[in-house]
Amino acid sequence: LGMLRIARNKRQYGEVVTVADKLLSESKLSPDLRQEILFARADAYFHTGKGENAADDWRELSKDTRSIYGAQSAYLLAQYQFDNKAIDTAEKTLNIFIDKGTPHNYWLARAFLLMADIYEKRGETFQARQYLQSLRNNYPASDDDIISRIDKKLSELGQTE
């Protein structure tokens, strides 16, 4: 596991995949370690242009949105789908994530921001603005970038009318 973390920190993505595959073949991994390894492999796949492989790992991880890896993976999977013009699929992924819930407010907020992007892409500016306003009114943290992302997006939406 140490080799995986070192390779990831050095952005040696090929090595990350190789080490992750070896580690994942072991049956005695705890669920937490398995998630960390899968997440590292997904990140490595994504950074080497193997988005579909990354999406497979994110899909598996997103089944458990109670974990930080699962919550982030649910968001990353939907973002990947959105970026690849699978708008309806991204919306379904986000709805599943939102319905499941997560204790990780940051990633849930990012999901709502992406949902607003989906509505904007469809020309449903009012709905996008509603998502953003609701998120702005209800987001508990102020020590991250969510509020500034919301404000930027609201400003952009205001300029489109």
Task: Give the predicted meaning of each segment.
Residues 1-161:
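Acidic, polar-rich low-complexity tracts and alpha-helical solenoid repeat scaffolds
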